[in-house]
Amino acid sequence: MEILDGKYILCSFLPGDEKGILDLWKTAFKSNMDPDLFKWKYLDNPYSKTMMLCVTDNSEIVTFYGGIPFKFQYNEDIVYVVNLMDIMSHPNHRENRIFEKTARRFIEYFCTPDNLLLMYGFPGEFHYSIGERILNYKKISNVLYLKAFPNELFNKKNSAQKNIVELEIIENYDGPAKEFDLVWENCKSYYPFSIVRDASFI
């Protein structure tokens, strides 16, 4: 989709766009993203690719709006949601509202009733203020949550008391993936509004 008389093109991600996105990351954030991290987050994801780009007429990627899709349990239905992240734009191409145009194109293209139930993210205050002003971002209500570190959960209260649970770091798991599916099947009724944590998620 061309905008501004063909000066820019809005398009979804295609194989080979990785380098341009990583170059944009370096310019926008003054740091480098490990290509393996990008591959793990966006390309090795077993679900769809949800990335919208704004590209100049000389093929430079100047805006990235996207995130990682997940299967999501919504009561009895399985739908898709996107965790927005790594949203960025080139500092020399922020005129003419191209960031807003890219974001709106993302919503038009990906956020259909058959594709996505919702988008969510964890922007900082500055970026949230931009989204609130031009994209109708909304804060969710206060959320109650529990936070604990494993070593705090399983510390011995006294020398005579033994831990009931022992923790072990597992870096590789060669067992059947269906075991993760079984755990999710047994637990999902307790999580009617939750990301599906089955084998494909793991």
Locate each region found by the language model.
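Basic/polar N-terminal segments that are highly enriched at the extreme N-terminus
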Residues: M1-L4
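Amide-forming acyltransferase catalytic core, primarily the GNAT-like/NAT-type
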Residues: G6-C11, E18-N58, V62-G66, V79, ...
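Generic anion/oxyanion-binding catalytic loop in active/binding sites
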Residues: L10, Q73, P91-N92, Y191
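Beta-strand-enriched cores of mature, soluble protein domains
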Residues: F13-G16, L84
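A short acidic/small-residue loop/turn micro-motif
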Residues: P69-K71
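Acyl-donor binding region in acyl/amide transferases
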Residues: N75-Y145
